[in-house]
Every structure is written in C-alpha cells, then in structure tokens.
Amino acid sequence: MTSNFSQAPLQLCYENVNASCIKTPYSPGLRVLLYMVFGFGAVLAVCGNLLVVISVLHFKQLHSPANFLIASLASADFLVGISVMPFSMVRSIESCWYFGDTFCSLHSCCDAAFCYSSLFHLCFISVDRYIAVTDPLVYPTKFTVSVSGICISISWILPLVYSSAVFYTGISATGIENLVSALNCVGGCQIVVNQDWVLIDFLLFLIPTLVMIILYSKIFLVAKQQAVKIETSISGSKGESSLESHKARVAKRERKAAKTLGVTVVAFMVSWLPYTIDTLIDAFMGFITPAYVYEICCWSAYYNSAMNPLIYAFFYPWFRKAIKLILSGEILKSHSSTMSLFSE
C-alpha cells in the first residue's frame, strides 16, 4: 500500500556531515524580502554611525565631553552593524551558521559586549545631561574631557570583560550541560546560558535603565521649572541682565540636548525590552518562545543601532549640516574642521 501524502525531504545545514543541524528555510520570496530588510538595517547602522563619528572627530566645534560620549556610542553601534548584524542576518534567514564554532563564540561575545557598551554609554550620557540641565554654568567644570574619557573607558572595558567571561570560560553553561549537548550540532550557533547568568543579564539591563528613567524624570522636572522661572523673569523685568540672559540661553540649549538624548534612551528601551523579557521567559520556562518571535525580538534590538543617527538627523541641525559637508566632500578642503555648524 502506498501513501497518498508525500513528506517534504528533510533539509540539513550540511548535507554530507554527520550530526548536522536541521535547516528550516523560508520561501524564496520571503528570503529575498528578509535579506533586504535586515541588510538595510546593517547598512544604515554602519553608514549612519560612521557619519556621527566623522562629524564629531573632524569638526572642532563638536569637540566637547558630551559629544565624545556620543561618538563613542556611535562607534559601538557601528561595530554592531559591521561585525554582528551581517552574520546574524545569514543565521536568521538560513537557520544555519556557516562561519565555524570559533567565530560563533567571537560573534556572540561581540554581540553582547557592543550592546552592553551602548547601554553603559547611554547611562553616562544621562548623567551628563542631568548635570548639564540642573547646573549648566558649573557643568563645564564638572564634566570635563578627562571625566568623559573615564566614562568611555568604563563603557568599553566592563562589557568586554563581562562578555568574554560569559562566552569563553564556560561558566554560563554550568548546570545545563545536558541541554548544551542536546543542542550541539554542526551548523548551529546557539549559546545557551543558565538561569543565574540570564538573571544577571536582566539586572545589567534593568539597573542602568532605572537610573536613566530616574535621571530623565528629574531632568524634565527641572527643565519645566527653569522654563517657568525664565518666563516669569522676562515678563517681570524687561531689562534682563546679561548674566541672566546667558544663563537662560545655556539652559535652553541643554534642555534641547537632553530632550534629544531622552528620545534616544526611550528608543533603546523600546527596542531592547522585548528581547530582554523573551530571554528571561525562555530561561525560566523552558524555551517556550517560537523561533520567529525570538528573531523578531532579536532584530528589534539590532535595529536600535541604526536608529540613533536618524534621531540625531531629525533633532540636530548641526548634524544635518555636517552630513552635507561630509557627503559633498567639503571636509577634504583645508580648514574645513573649523567650519561653523551652528546657526546663531
């Protein structure tokens, strides 16, 4: 007796290799669409953040402690776009890892390190904005270039050390050796982390996030009070002193910068919260999340690396002007670094 139903042949990542992972390919049309969407995100992350870095480093008018933090943040997002997203794109769409076990560990380590670096940068930027808004006249003496350098160093060194410890010592797999062995196959790159380290990861996301929420809540409260005070001062006295006028201008500028970077922080939290919650649920409830849901959460987080330059371009006229000068080749001219980017 023959069956009327034909079963689709099982596809493997490596057809002629024992213990190969099973391949679950998408339809050709969907594969093309996904490559376009994911590829666009990677290109945008690379090009957009490269423009931010070039702008801050080239134009002397942008050489400030706060902007150095922004350039360092853009460097982390640039590295996500160039060293993480392209390989994750192939893994997500082909459902196979074709780049070897050694690079799998390196890729996973870089993925975690650069993303935590972004989070640390944003946390320090929140501190910077809090000082700038609450005490704008004293701010230049408190948040100096050396302080900014210390913040940048911490934002890079701690994530790199932590990620290396997690992915290269094997400590994160303690207690789940059987699960790791069951998931191990040729053509896979699934780094499984035990519940303790997933909880640590969650706290590393939650604590800086809470710090940023508290600081920005205080920032906008102070900004509102300043706006009311300035409005009352102007309406009550037409002959405003030059000092008060200067203080009002400085406060207004810092409030605008805080608002822009506040949007950046919100974008980061919205992008990363689904992924963080998903990994927490999977670790404590037995990996119940469907693969496609995990991929959506993962790429939502990746796309955050491409969003910051778009936010800067929308809110910062100086960044739009810098982009024009860079793309037109004007920065190749002598003395271009001293060009004015701000309209007075």
Curated annotation (Swiss-Prot):
Ranges in the topological domain labelled Cytoplasmic: 55-67, 128-146, 218-260, 315-344
An annotated Gene Ontology molecular function: trace-amine receptor activity
Gene Ontology cellular component annotations, sorted alphabetically: plasma membrane
InterPro entries to which the protein is assigned, alphabetical: GPCR_Rhodpsn, GPCR_Rhodpsn_7TM, TAAR, TAAR_fam
Topology feature Extracellular, residues: 1-33, 89-102, 168-196, 282-291
Keywords: Cell membrane, Disulfide bond, G-protein coupled receptor, Glycoprotein, Membrane, Receptor, Transducer, Transmembrane, Transmembrane helix
Membrane topology listed for this record: Multi-pass membrane protein
Annotated Pfam families: 7tm_1
Subcellular location: Cell membrane
Keyword check for Disulfide bond: yes
Annotated TM spans: 34-54, 68-88, 103-127, 147-167, 197-217, 261-281, 292-314
Glycosylation sites: 4, 18
Keyword Glycoprotein carried by entry: yes
Disulfide bonds: 21-185, 96-189
GO BP annotation list: G protein-coupled receptor signaling pathway
Role summary: Olfactory receptor activated by trace amines. Trace amine compounds are enriched in animal body fluids and act on trace amine-associated receptors (TAARs) to elicit both intraspecific and interspecific innate behaviors. Ligand-binding causes a conformation change that triggers signaling via G(s)-class of G alpha proteins (GNAL or GNAS).
Family: Belongs to the G-protein coupled receptor 1 family.
PANTHER family (UniProt xref): HISTAMINE RECEPTOR-RELATED G-PROTEIN COUPLED RECEPTOR (PTHR24249), TRACE AMINE-ASSOCIATED RECEPTOR 8 (PTHR24249:SF405)
Protein name stated in the entry: Trace amine-associated receptor 8a
Organism: Rattus norvegicus
Higher taxonomy: Eukaryota, Metazoa, Chordata, Craniata, Vertebrata
